[in-house]
Amino acid sequence: MAKSFQHPIVVLANGRFPSHSNPLEVLDSAGTVICTDGSADTLLKFDRTPHVIIGDLDSTKLKKSDFKGLWILNQDQHKTDLQKTLQWCLLNGLNDVVILGAMGKREDHSLGNLHILSEFSNKMNIHFVTDHACIYCFIGEKTFPSTKGQQISITAIEHVQSINTIGLKYVLDKESFPPACNGISNEAEGEEFTIDTSLPVWLFINHP
């Protein structure tokens, strides 16, 4: 079924609608835009139309009869609309997804969405793009592009026994890394940096 959707795949969650050029460029270049419930209304206010709407559909003012795209009703009260949307993406072979609107507005929703990122990061290629940063969750070794002086923050989800970095100003060398603030506001030294972590971390690559 994935062949019927145009790539890139962008999911718009119902947090703060993007205003920075980076997430807006992601939205403008999307082949398929999937909205989580009420985010469809926000998208329409900005003269853009979603291709898919997913959720319990109790937040959107749209009616199914007025929507020409794919309308997916999922009333599972034990999952958020973002969880339902990502699960639907997996079931349909959409394994490469960028998420906008995941942060901002309610802080509890933002924190919950970060944990959803960690939940799905080992199942699909996924990251958030916000007005401030690209946010990833990963385990093991991974290299990311950067610019010199770019602000990089690393946050442990649980106590990491060993983490190494290459290409960051403040080096971590097989260090124990607790879920605290000691990984905030590091800096990239050049065009790329590498992190190798024994347990999942959140990585914030702030926009230059």
What does each model-identified segment do?
Residues 1-64:
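N-terminal beta-strand-loop-alpha-helix module at the start
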Residues 139-208:
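Long, charged alpha-helical interface segments
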Residues 30-31, 50, 67-68, 94, ...:
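Short, well-ordered alpha-helix to beta-strand connector turns
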Residues 118, 123-147, 152:
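Class I SAM-dependent methyltransferase SAM-binding "motif I" and its flanking Rossmann-like core
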Residues 108-118:
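Short Gly/Thr/Asp-enriched flexible loops that form oxyanion-binding sites at enzyme active sites
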Residues 69-92:
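Short phosphate-binding loop-to-helix
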